[in-house]
């Protein structure tokens, strides 16, 4: 892949032309360690708590990641207790996730090809005149996420109330496929939206905040998933997740509508 980071490109150009590189003076080890901690730990946490875009994107991505781990634990238990599936048959129930994942990435590619790229070419055509240099709004990344915000709760509620002995076992597997489809439709676009918003430098810190939050929630979710499903039953335990997804469904739509205002108020200037 071609290098796209501006500072690296500038350094390469300067080196080819024999120009002096604008490098920082040698730092002591202690200052280098402090700078490393600041950029890899302090900044991501600061962005997580002070930047609305980072905070809500981390909330969305953490929920999607945690949802995957929850189903890894809850799905085998559900099909064992409801349908009497053996250990080997329980593994086959994840075929819904495989199918849903395949269709989800196909939809993301289609959304990029027929929506995002079309909007990008239209924007470049309209702003190609001299003096009209303007950044392409990253909100156009959110089309698939807005679709996924409607599909995810539907899949969760469908799984919640079709995972019953009287209903054929294929139906909840289809519900799982719909759930993972909607989840990936949210996860990938909002992550790309956040990186596009902050650029390569601060986008890396924002991605670090996302990693911190989603792995923390994923680890915690494993501690209560089985107990929650045993106490509430598959119907109400999954419905609880559905209500959480329904509560977070407006977030991509809010970003699409008010994202420019939030970006304008950001304390972190985007680096190209």
Residue ranges and their predicted role:
Residues 51, 61-62, 209:
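Short acidic/histidine-centered micro-motifs embedded in hydrophobic/aromatic stretches
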